[in-house]
Amino acid sequence: MGQKINPLGFRVGVTQQHYSYWFAQPKNYSKFLEEDEKVRTCIEKYVQKQIKNSSNYGGIARIEIEGKTDLLQIEIYTGFPDSLVEENGLGIDKLRTNIENLLKKKSQKIQITLKNVLQPYGEPRILAEHIALQLENRVAFRRTVKKAIELAKKTDIKGIKIQIAGRLNGNEIARVEWVREGRVPLQTIRAHINYCYYPAQTIYGVLGIKIWVFRDEE
């Protein structure tokens, strides 16, 4: 059988950049890695809480973290940054305070920047969150996938593949279903492929959502 490699890791240094920029001594690497993961989890939980009741749902496309000795720069790429900014910027201040309490590093300042994604539904992470929300509300998966592809086709992408695995529509036997529109050349390293895996917690169990988005070739 063919072995499936992560499309993002496969293209790092060619068309894909790292989402984390920091350096650590070998003995401290695991500690830095754990802190990086905690910061990402903290941001995702906070954002989900903030936009849970928002009509302008955009979700997070990606989080980029750059760590220095005295500064931690965090860039959050989201579909609708306005839903995260409260009056006088209190939303960002609250998030910064949460991260400071989590890391407990008084010598390191935290700088958070929100960046707007012009085409939210061209981002696999935002699409996956949208699909997961529909599946958790017991919408039929074929209808959900069809709607997601319609949203994606309104952007400038050249191809998309969506795969859902698990007890689809509550069936006793788990299975894998996938749909592809356009080209998705996974073997071409110079192809700009965005990829996301996202779990959906349904009453029948966990459904695994995988999305590949093809934008362009170098």
Curated annotation (Swiss-Prot):
Keywords noted in UniProt: Chloroplast, Plastid, Ribonucleoprotein, Ribosomal protein, RNA-binding, rRNA-binding
GO cellular component: chloroplast; cytosolic small ribosomal subunit
Biological process according to GO: translation
Segments forming domain KH type-2: 47-118
GO molecular function terms noted in the UniProt entry: rRNA binding; structural constituent of ribosome
Main location: plastid
Location of this chain's protein in the cell: Plastid, Chloroplast
Pfam families: Ribosomal_S3_C (PF00189)
Keyword Plastid annotated: yes
Family: Belongs to the universal ribosomal protein uS3 family.
HAMAP family per UniProt: Ribosomal_uS3_B
NCBIfam families, alphabetized: rpsC_bact (TIGR01009)
Subunit relationships: Part of the 30S ribosomal subunit.
Name of this chain's protein: Small ribosomal subunit protein uS3c
Organism: Angiopteris evecta
Taxonomic lineage: Eukaryota, Viridiplantae, Streptophyta, Embryophyta, Tracheophyta
